[in-house]
Amino acid sequence: MTNRIMNKQTIITALLALLAMTGQGQTSFDPNGGCLNVVDFSFGQGIGEYGNNCVSANYLHEVFINEQFCIGGGIGYSHHKEYKFSAIPVYFSTHYFFLDNRFSPFANLRVGGFALFNAKNVGTNEKYSISKEKQGFSLYISPSIGIKMHITPNIGVLASVCDEAYLVNAFDNSRNDYRSKLIHSLGVNIGVCFQIKGW
């Protein structure tokens, strides 16, 4: 009986400590607390005729303009299942947090270019094949909407729905030739955001 009471007290104490910890989460970002750093992972399903399944990881570093808006840049890695290639996107990024609260919906836009490598389905003249010729400008664009939640004053989590699009020279079945195509994947993005003063 005594052990059961002690176990209940331990659980209640742990829950109260957790509640106190989460209750200290700030209601907004502090522009003087350092830049916004984000590490995230996304898993997407192909959409559209030329879409493909994509897995990616990214790091973003953004400067706060105010508590709700920040701009900066990022770099990532992605693997494309159907097209059988990998890419390293480098891009401009911006976040806008709609509310000055601990929980806030946000919008994120990433625009830049990418380096394509490790391509295996090249010049086969079939769907999901990419051209042997060197690509020109390689556009990368990824809009997303989601929600942010602070866990501590300097750490939070982000969850969003994103559309990752890459411009590639893909085989067009209807024209029997390679054409510039935006290949899309619609997915879920999960990340951690943090601020380190002076960084």
Task: Tell what function each PLM region has.
Residues 28-45, 186:
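Transmembrane beta-strand segments of Gram-negative outer membrane beta-barrel proteins
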Residues 37-39, 59-61, 163, 184:
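Polar/charged side chains located within well-ordered beta-strands of beta-rich proteins
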Residues 167-181:
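C-terminal/domain-terminus segments
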Residues 156-162:
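Conserved active-site loop/cleft motifs that coordinate metal ions or position small ligands
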Residues 1-31, 35, 196-199:
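Bacterial Sec-dependent N-terminal signal peptides
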Residues 8, 179-190:
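Short glycine/proline-enriched turn or capping motifs at secondary-structure junctions
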Residues 41, 55-144, 149-155, 189, ...:
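Gram-negative (and chloroplast) outer-membrane scaffold detector with strong preference
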Residues 30, 45-50, 79-83, 130-135, ...:
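Outer-membrane beta-barrel domain signature
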